[in-house]
Amino acid sequence: MSVVGKRVVDELCRVVSSYLGQSGQSLDLERCIDGAPVYAKGGATAICTVRMQHGCVYHLEFVYKFWAHLLEEMHYPFSPCFVISNNGLSTTLKCFLCRPSDAVSQFGHVLPVESDVYLAKNTSVVLGQDDFTKFKASLVFSKNLGVYNSMVICRTYFTDYRQVLQFLVVTPKSHKRLKSLLETVYCLAAPVADSAAQGGAGFPTNGRDARACTSDVTAVYWAGQGGRTVRILGAFQWSLGRAVALVRRSWPWISAGIAFLCLGLVWMRPS
């Protein structure tokens, strides 16, 4: 892989690690190590692979649009392609620069993008620009299909017996705020694209700015029902965790109180 190609791969992997998961969520990410053919059409090598985990939210369309933006600035002739597949051992997201020519033979039967996708062994979901648009078309007005008005996220439900992907469309509480944040994110990446297009020496990336923008962008997202569900579930899980911890700490006192109550009932029982 050429020096410029390596820099492109480095930057695309940084985008995934910075923006795919929610703030504070760690990603099990593996980048290509054998030199992906960056400028080859239909290559079988993914730029990076993310092992998806249970109960997580992934900002798929946001990362996809970011990739598309960077590649367009580099005058790359093809569109990115994301593939989520289940090989029986794990469910992974593989990010390609374009759709692999042997997607079916690699990842099995391709399922359509729906609200709930049951990802059985040797099945996959292939995501391109048209797939995001088609999924949103039945859920939002045509004027809201753009990146500033709605985005597709994926929430995972994984057990030992079933792998489920839930695709949701989220909309921002403030369109102006989201547009401003996205423009800031793209501006951070603009020097990267210029450097790659010109074969420059480096890719200036500020990890702190990236993390800050990630938190701000996800905070602005407001779902109709789906987003509220995400936030309510998060609050419920936090409250449940605090309640369990409180019960554990207080259990000696609680058990003593129950014992005294039982003794009192025995003493008060008429003979």
From Swiss-Prot:
InterPro entries: Herpesvirus_viron_egress-type. Plays an essential role in virion nuclear egress, the first step of virion release from infected cell. Within the host nucleus, NEC1 interacts with the newly formed capsid through the vertexes and directs it to the inner nuclear membrane by associating with NEC2. Induces the budding of the capsid at the inner nuclear membrane as well as its envelopment into the perinuclear space. The gene is NEC2. This is Nuclear egress protein 2. GO terms for cellular component: host cell nuclear inner membrane; membrane. It is found in: Host nucleus inner membrane. The keyword Transmembrane helix applies. HAMAP family: HSV_NEC2. Forms a heterohexameric complex with NEC1. It comes from Human herpesvirus 8 type P (isolate GK18). Phosphorylated. The chain crosses the membrane at residues 250-267. The keyword Transmembrane helix applies. Belongs to the herpesviridae NEC2 protein family. It is a single-pass membrane protein. Residues 1-249 are perinuclear space. Residues 268-271 are nuclear. Keywords: Host membrane, Host nucleus, Late protein, Membrane, Phosphoprotein, Transmembrane, Transmembrane helix.
